[in-house]
């Protein structure tokens, strides 16, 4: 990558970070203006268009980055789990760390999931579907259940996780700890329920797999 290309990528990165920094519990992406973002990034408003067609393209890039960031962290958590440790507790702790370190990224996903822009809703839906698919892959590999079961389990887990994440955004340390404990319990209940439901179905044909991986 040449010097000019590197500088362009650096400025593009500055615009994304500037937009994230202006989000808050009181301020959504829809309220941001091109001028504000450009000023925060230290460039002229007209220079914005060298990097993004419009503010919406910037927002869609932010959605993609938020989803990717979360998925990468969860992959790292699964790698740690492979070395020993609780599957669910490690995953929940990693998720809560993500919210604590990147609250505006998670806020963006939550808000745009049900926002007024069809393009943003579709982008968030894709990111959530990627998240569900990766979790279903992991569950299928670890628990040896059919894809239909692991997808249903993964979807239920992700739904509960995102709901807990929304609660965790603006609470204190102790309340977040309590939320984390509740979430661990709920996910364990889903995990055990999914396995025993599958085992009941398999008992009809006397095909019972090994027990589900203990969390």
Swiss-Prot record:
Main subcellular location of this protein, as a coarse class: cytoplasm
Sequence ranges assigned to domain HTH tetR-type in this UniProt record: 10-70
MF terms in GO: DNA binding; DNA-binding transcription factor activity
Ranges of the DNA-binding region feature: 33-52
Subcellular location: Cytoplasm
PROSITE patterns: HTH_TETR_2 (PS50977)
One Gene Ontology CC term in the entry: cytoplasm
Pfam families: TetR_C_46, TetR_N
Gene3D superfamilies: Homeodomain-like, Tetracycline Repressor, domain 2
InterPro entries in UniProt: DesT_TetR_C, Homeodomain-like_sf, HTH_TetR, HTH_transcr_repressor_FabR, Tscrpt_reg_HTH_FabR
Keywords, ordered alphabetically: Cytoplasm, DNA-binding, Fatty acid biosynthesis, Fatty acid metabolism, Lipid biosynthesis, Lipid metabolism, Repressor, Transcription, Transcription regulation
GO biological process: fatty acid biosynthetic process; negative regulation of fatty acid biosynthetic process
Self-association and partners: Homodimer.
Task performed by this protein: Represses the transcription of fabB, involved in unsaturated fatty acid (UFA) biosynthesis. By controlling UFA production, FabR directly influences the physical properties of the membrane bilayer.
NCBIfam families in the cross-refs: PRK11202.1
PANTHER family, A to Z: HTH-TYPE TRANSCRIPTIONAL REPRESSOR FABR
Protein name (database record): HTH-type transcriptional repressor FabR
Gene: fabR
